[in-house]
Amino acid sequence: MEFHITEDDIASVLTEALPFPVEDTAVKISRDGTIAVTAAVTRQALTESNLVPGKLRTALLFLPERCKLYGAWSAAVPNGKLSLTCRTIKLEGFTLPEQTAQALSDAFAAQWNTRMEQRDFTPQTIQWQDGEAVLLG
């Protein structure tokens, strides 16, 4: 059994999983297993999400109202669940804290795992192609 994940699928699930709205989302899946995402987010949405810790929240005041968000993840399927590891996540070129990266990764993976559970699918491995990841069960 196979579960295909396309770049459009990732953009859609990411939009659902994030605790703040994003626009202009672009996703690139590479054969090396990298999932790269760019999106635009407003400073106000980030502030209201409570995802950004105190000191960084102050720094948000100095960013433009509309900010570029970039993230790159790798994926694995330990124990029949999709797990995402954040390689980097940046807002306007500034690296976000590890706790923020982990929270986003966990929310993103949880959304995928819910979808697979709804289809009674348990992944065992991932095959990477340009533009698509194929989970094999």
Positions of the model-derived regions?
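Extracellular/lumenal and peripheral-membrane lipid-interaction modules
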Residues: M1-G137
